[in-house]
A protein has these predicted regions:
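Glycan-recognition surfaces
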Residues: 378, 382-415, 468-580
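Conserved, mostly hydrophobic/aromatic
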Residues: 41, 146, 251, 298, ...
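Aromatic- and carboxylate-lined catalytic core of secreted/periplasmic carbohydrate-active enzymes
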Residues: 570-571, 575-614
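Polysaccharide-binding surfaces and accessory modules of carbohydrate-active proteins
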Residues: 21-38, 42, 55-233, 242, ...
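Carbohydrate-binding surface patches
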Residues: 616-658, 692, 696-698
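C-terminal beta-strand-rich structural cap/linker in extracellular carbohydrate-active enzymes
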Residues: 673-701
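Aromatic-lined carbohydrate-binding/catalytic grooves of carbohydrate-active enzymes
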Residues: 291-425, 431, 435, 445-447, ...
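Short Pro-Gly-centered flexible turn/kink motifs
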Residues: 41, 246-265, 691-700
Length: 701
C-alpha cells in the first residue's frame, strides 16, 4: 500500500508540473463544431449537433482521469448547457431544433488563459446567444457565461436565466455530500443555494473527489441548483424571492454573470480544495489579481463615529504612521452632507488638505468613507432630480435610517449613477485617495428595509427588473471610477450589498474589498477577535481572504497580539483609539507589521488558506488558528490559545508540500527548528510562548 501511495503522489505531482509548463488550449474538431478547452489538469469537450444542440460531451479531471459527465451513469443526458425564457418562450441550448450554428472563435484571455466563444442563432425568435468558455493556466476550472442579443424590432423580456446547466457530478447520488455557505457547512444533496452560497462544494464521500460550483451573480440575485437528488448542476439567477428580469431593446445585448466550476480531490497535494480554490479566486477572480499587496488600513469609525475631529485625527495620524500602517481612513463625519463632497467645517475647520498632507508625510495614503445612493435632502441632486428617487410599493420616496438620520435613497437604474460616479471620482482625484469605503443602502439594506424600486420612468420596467438593474448600476459606478483611477481600492460594504456579513464573486467583480462586518470590540467581554475569525474561517475556502475587511477590531484593546494576529488572516484592518497605545506598543505593532509586509512581498501566501484547531466554531475553551501558505510550503501560521489551558497544540496539514522548512516564532524571535513536509503532514507540536496566548510562526525554506 505504501508503494502504491508513493507512486500516486509521484504521478500527481508530475501532472501538476506539466500543468504549470503547458499552455492552455482550445482544440477544434474537423467539422468545426466540436471543441475541447482545457489544460493539463481539466478538459471540457463541447459540441454542437443539429439534433442535440449545444452540449457538453465530457468534462474530465485529468489529475484522476475521471469524466464527471459519466460517473453517475450513462443514462443521463448532458444537461441544457444554458436556458432562459424570452417573453413566454423557453429556450435551451440543448434543443437542437431551436438553434442554428453561426460561428466559433478562440482568443487569448488574461491571466494566461484562452477563451472559446460559440455563437448561435434562434430559429423561431429574433435572438442570438453567444456562449463563452474560459480556461486558465494551472487551474482545474472552466468558467462559463452567455450573452443574449435582441435582433428584432420589439422589446424582449428575459427571465429564468441559467448560464450553466450541466449534468455533472463526482459520483452517484448515494455517495455524494454537499457543503454550502461558502463551501463550509454540510447540507443535503438536493439543494438550492442563495445569497450566502456563492460557492457550493459537492464531493464523493468514497474517493474524496469533488467540484466547487461558484456563482458570480451578485447578492440576492444568485441561485444555484443541485438538481434532483444528485442529478446535475444549474448556475443561475434567482426566480422567486429576488426574481431576475431583464428587458432587451432592439439591438441590445445582455451579458450574464459567470459560473466557475473547479475540480478537486481531498488530501491529494495541491489538488486539495484548500489549494485549488484560494489559488483560483485570488489569481483570476480578484480584480487586481496576483499583483495585489494588501495595505494595512486604519479606520476612525469606532470609537469616534461621527464625532471625529481635526485634533483627534492629527494625533491618530502620528500613531498610525509609527505603527507602519498604509492607509488612514476617515469614516462618516468628514462630510457636511451625505451625497456631497463639501467638508464638515465644524469638525475639520481647515478642510482635508492639511489632513492629506499629514497622512502622506507619515508615508501613508488617505482613505475616505462615502455613501453611494443614500443622500441628504439638502443636496442639489436631491432637489433638482426628484424623479431619480427610489420609490416603494405605494409610490412613496424611499428613505433609509443612517447615523446621520433618515436619508433619501436614489435609484442606480437612473442617470443618478453618473452623478454618483463623478462625485466619488472627483473626491479620489482631489485628495489623492488610495482607498474608498463605499457604503449604505442601494438595492436594499441589511436591516430589514424592503428591496428594489417601484418608480416609473427609470431604466427598469418593473420592480423585479430594478433588482438586477441596481446591481448593474453599482458596477457602472465602479467601472467609471476605475477608468479614472485604476489603482484605487474600492471597498463595497456588506450594507451596500444588502446582507449581514455577505461577500461574493459578484461583489469582487465590481470592487476590490468588502467591509464584511462590524464586530463589536469596544470593551471587555465584547464579541471581539474570536468572532472576527469565525467570519474569516467560514468564508476562507471560497473567498480570497485578503478581500475581507473584518471590522471593527480595535488595536488598543488587550490583548493587542490577538488583534494583530487575527488581522493577518484577512485584509488587515484596525480601528480603535491609537492614542491609548504606548510608544512601545506602537513600535511593537510596527515591527510585526513590517515583518508581515516583507513576508507577503516575498511569499504568495494567498495560494492556500488552512483553518486549524476548532475552526468551524471557535470557542473560548478550545484553540483555533490558520495557516497561509504558498504552494511551495512557505508562509505563516497564527495559533490562538483562547481560554484553553493548553501549553502546546498539534498542527497537522495533510497536504503540506515536500521539503525542509525553518520555523521561527515571530512572537519571541526564536528559531524553533527545521521540519520536513512529511512532519507537517503527520503533525508537529508547537508551544505557546509563556507570556502570550498567541503564537505567530514564520515558515521558510
Amino acid at each position: 500500500m505504501r508503494t502504491i501511495s508513493v507512486l500516486a503522489s509521484v504521478l500527481f505531482f508530475a501532472a501538476i508540473m506539466n500543468a504549470q509548463a503547458d499552455s492552455v488550449y482550445v482544440r477544434t474538431g474537423a467539422d468545426g463544431k466540436d471543441w475541447t478547452i482545457g489544460n493539463a489538469i481539466a478538459e471540457r469537450e463541447v459540441r454542437f449537433d443539429p439534433r442535440r444542440g449545444l452540449y457538453t460531451a465530457s468534462w474530465r479531471h485529468l489529475v484522476t482521469g475521471t469524466d464527471l459527465m459519466n460517473v453517475a451513469g450513462a443514462h443521463r443526458r448532458g444537461g441544457s448547457e444554458f436556458s432562459f425564457l424570452a417573453d413566454a418562450d423557453s429556450l435551451a441550448g440543448s434543443n437542437g431544433s431551436a438553434w442554428e450554428f453561426v460561428a466559433a472563435e478562440t482568443q487569448r484571455l488574461a491571466p494566461s488563459g484562452k477563451l472559446l466563444t460559440i455563437k448561435l442563432r434562434a430559429r423561431a425568435k429574433p435572438i442570438d446567444v453567444t456562449a463563452f468558455y474560459a480556461v486558465y493556466e494551472a487551474h482545474p476550472v472552466v468558467r462559463k457565461w452567455i450573452a443574449i442579443t435582441n435582433r428584432g424590432q420589439t422589446l424582449i423580456t428575459l427571465s429564468h436565466l441559467s448560464f450553466e446547466t450541466v449534468n455533472l457530478a463526482p459520483g452517484p447520488p448515494n455517495v455524494l455530500q454537499v457543503s454550502a455557505f461558502y463551501g463550509s457547512q454540510p447540507r443535503e444533496i438536493f439543494f438550492t443555494g442563495r445569497v450566502d452560497d456563492t460557492a457550493v462544494l459537492e464531493r464523493n464521500s468514497l474517493t474524496g473527489e469533488g467540484l466547487m460550483v461558484m456563482n458570480e451573480a451578485p447578492g440576492y440575485m444568485k441561485r444555484t441548483e443541485l438538481s434532483g437528488w444528485g442529478e446535475g448542476v444549474q448556475v443561475m439567477y434567482d426566480t422567486d424571492l429576488f426574481p431576475f428580469e431583464r428587458s432587451l431593446q432592439p439591438g441590445e445585448t445582455f451579458t450574464s454573470a459567470r459560473s466557475s466550476i473547479a475540480f478537486c480531490v481531498d488530501g491529494r497535494g495541491t489538488a486539495d480544495p484548500r489549494w485549488v480554490v484560494p489559488s483560483y479566486t485570488s489569481q483570476v477572480l480578484m480584480k487586481k489579481g496576483t499583483a495585489y499587496q494588501p495595505p494595512w488600513i486604519y479606520n476612525t469609525w469606532e470609537p469616534f463615529e461621527r464625532g471625529i475631529t481635526r485634533s483627534i485625527t492629527m494625533d491618530l495620524i502620528a500613531a498610525a504612521g509609527r505603527m507602519g500602517l498604509d492607509v488612514f481612513t476617515i469614516d462618516d463625519g468628514w462630510q457636511a452632507d451625505y451625497g456631497d463632497n463639501a467638508i464638515n467645517r465644524k469638525l475639520f475647520e481647515n478642510g482635508l488638505d492639511e489632513i492629506q498632507a499629514a497622512v502622506e508625510t507619515k508615508g501613508m495614503r488617505l482613505g475616505l468613507w462615502v455613501p453611494l445612493a443614500a443622500i441628504s435632502p439638502n443636496t442639489a441632486v436631491y432637489r433638482e432630480h426628484p424623479e431619480w428617487l427610489c420609490k416603494d410599493i405605494h409610490g412613496r420616496p424611499k428613505f433609509t435610517g443612517t447615523m446621520a438620520g433618515s436619508q433619501a435613497v436614489m435609484c442606480l437604474a437612473t442617470p443618478y449613477r453618473e452623478v454618483a460616479a463623478k462625485r466619488i471620482s472627483d473626491l479620489i482625484g482631489r485628495y489623492h485617495l488610495k482607498y474608498v469605503k463605499v457604503d449604505l443602502t442601494t438595492v436594499f439594506n441589511a436591516y430589514g428595509e424592503s428591496p428594489g424600486c417601484y418608480a416609473q420612468g427609470h431604466d427598469h420596467r418593473s420592480w423585479a427588473e430594478s433588482l438586477g438593474r441596481i446591481y448593474e448600476g453599482i458596477q457602472y459606478v465602479t467601472d467609471r471610477i476605475y477608468r479614472d483611477h485604476p489603482e484605487v481600492l474600492l471597498d463595497l460594504t456588506f450594507e451596500l450589498w444588502g446582507q449581514k456579513h455577505v461577500i461574493d464573486y459578484g461583489l469582487l467583480g465590481a470592487g476590490d474589498l468588502d467591509w464584511l462586518s462590524n464586530v463589536d470590540d469596544g470593551r471587555r467581554g465584547s464579541a471581539g477577535p474570536r468572532q472576527a475569525r469565525t467570519l474569516l474561517y467560514l468564508r476562507s475556502l471560497a473567498i480570497p481572504s485578503e478581500t475581507m475587511l473584518i471590522g471593527n477590531l480595535q488595536a488598543d484593546m488587550p490583548p493587542i497580539e490577538e488583534r494583530l494576529a487575527t488581522a493577518m488572516g484577512s485584509g488587515p484592518l484596525f480601528l480603535g483609539d491609537l492614542r491609548k497605545l504606548t510608544p512601545a506598543e506602537q513600535d511593537w505593532f510596527g515591527e510585526k507589521i513590517r515583518w508581515f509586509k516583507t513576508l507577503r512581498k516575498e511569499v504568495p501566501v494567498q495560494e492556500g488558506f488552512f483553518p486549524l484547531g476548532n475552526w468551524s466554531q471557535p470557542g473560548a475553551a478550545t484553540w483555533d488558528g490558520f495557516a497561509r501558505l504558498s504552494r511551495q510550503g512557505e508562509g505563516m501560521m497564527a495559533l490562538f490559545k483562547n481560554e484553553s489551558r493548553l501549553d502546546q497544540v498539534e498542527v497537522k496539514l495533510a497536504t503540506f508540500p515536500d521539503g525542509t522548512y525553518r520555523v521561527r516564532s515571530v512572537m519571541t524571535g526564536k528559531t524553533l527548528g527545521s521540519f520536513t513536509g512529511e512532519q507537517f503532514r503527520q503533525g508537529i507540536q508547537f508551544r505557546f510562548p509563556a507570556e502570550y496566548k498567541v503564537e505567530l510562526l514564520e515558515i521558510r525554506k
